[in-house]
Amino acid sequence: MSDVFVREGVVEDFNELMRLAIDATRENAFVEPDTMMLAEHMYAALTRQMGVAGVIGGGPGEPLEGAIVLRVGPVWYSKSPIIEEKAIYVSPEFRSAKGGRARKLAEWAKGVSDNLGIPLSIGVLSNTRTEAKIRLYERVFGAPAGVYFLYNAKTGLTEG
C-alpha cells in the first residue's frame, strides 16, 4: 500500500479492530484485559455510539494495519464533552514501513477534535519506546500538559 490514509471504521471492521485491540493490550496493558469490555468499546466506536474509530488498511472488513479508538463523553468534573483517546496502535510489521501510520492516526484524532470543536485528551502510557512516542505526539500536538505515573505496575503483559 503506497498511499497510507485513515478512514473511519465501520461495523465490518469489528473483527480486525478486535484483533488490533487484543494485540495492543498484550503489548501495553498493565492489568489483564476483559475481552467483552474491549468488544463493547470497539463496537461503540464503530457505530458512533459515544465515539469513533479511525483505521488504516484495506476496505471495510479487510486486514487493518493500525487504528485509533476515541470516546466522546464528559470528564469526571464536568458535563462538557471531551474526546478521550482509548487506544492508538500500529501492528509491529507496519511500524517501520513508509507512511507514518502512527502520526496519521494522531493527526486524524486532531482532525476529529477540530471538526467537533471539543478538546482531545491523548497521551503516552507505555514503558516501551516512550521517548519516541512522546516526540511524535509533541510534533503533532505541541507541548505536553503533564505526565503520567504507574505505581506497582508496568505496561506490557507479554515480553518482547
Language-model features: where?
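Conserved acetyl-CoA-binding loop-helix of GNAT-fold acetyltransferases
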Residues: 90, 96-111
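A short helix-loop-beta-strand connector motif used in the catalytic cores of GNAT acetyltransferases and
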Residues: 42-56
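A short beta-loop-alpha structural element at the N-terminal edge
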Residues: 3-19
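Conserved GNAT-fold acetyl-CoA-binding loop/helix
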Residues: 22-43
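Conserved acetyl-CoA binding element of GNAT-fold acetyltransferases
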Residues: 79-93
